[in-house]
Regions:
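A short glycine-rich, Lys/Arg-flanked "PGG" loop and its adjoining helix->strand segment in the class I
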Residues: 155-168
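Class I SAM-dependent transferase core
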Residues: 1-79, 108-125
Length: 219
């Protein structure tokens, strides 16, 4: 299914306004997040400098589009893997009432995530500084991951957090179908592909359900 491509900053802001109807406070939080992200990127490699002129398209709308695929506002925990710059996790936390768990193993990035959450007053954000393998298992409603790991490894590592009602939201760039085809058939059937709103050549894997080791053995 084709979607309208958000190819400029005005279009990205307009789409966010229409899709999520942010309050004045939420718009302010998004603007503040952008400012903090740009400032911190001069200190550590959070985003490519080439994307700074198009922050609303490349980072804010790119993150917000995942929330549009799971509108269960306030329903269960959102687990964001390899949160890094807080994309999409902090954008989700700003635009929704969802409790968001940001998992990141690098200390400097965790320090940044905590400082932004505090600065923006995001009481619905928890930052966990550890590799995913060392985090206690808990059921989550949504799992997102932006440039975290190859798809098969991502699913192996995060399967224990999934339930029958878990929604998987996984941006995979140009290789979505290729990575999906390498999965066991039971896993493949759990996912479908959606076109990204921010890049004509990028796709998002959308899945539903519980991933199990037993399914992995079925080809």
């Amino acid at each position: 299914m084709s979607v309208e491509l958000l190819d400029n900053e005005d279009a990205a802001r307009a789409w966010i306004g229409e899709a999520f109807e942010p309050t004045a406070g939420q718009w302010t939080q998004l603007e503040r997040f952008i400012a903090l992200l740009i400032a911190e990127s001069a200190q550590q490699n959070l985003i490519a400098s080439s994307t700074i002129p198009t922050m609303w398209v490349r980072h804010i709308a790119d993150s917000a589009q995942l929330l549009a695929f799971d509108t269960r506002d306030g329903d269960g925990l959102w687990l964001d893997l390899g949160s890094g710059a807080g994309l999409p996790g902090l954008v989700v936390a700003i635009l929704s009432a969802r409790a968001v768990l940001l998992v990141e193993s690098r200390k400097r990035r965790c320090d940044f995530l905590r400082s932004v959450a505090a600065d923006l007053g995001l009481a619905n954000v928890e930052v966990v500084e550890a590799p995913l393998e060392r985090i206690d298992t808990r059921p989550v409603s949504t799992i997102s991951a932006r440039a975290f790991a190859p798809l098969d490894k991502l699913l192996d590592l995060s399967a224990r957090f999934s339930t029958e009602s878990t929604r998987w939201l996984l941006p995979k760039g140009r290789n979505a179908l290729k990575e999906l085809a390498l999965l066991p058939q039971p896993w493949q059937r759990m996912f479908h592909v959606e076109q990204s709103r921010t890049d004509a050549e990028s796709q998002i894997l959308i899945g539903s359900g519980k991933i199990t080791a037993k399914q992995r053995g079925k080809r």
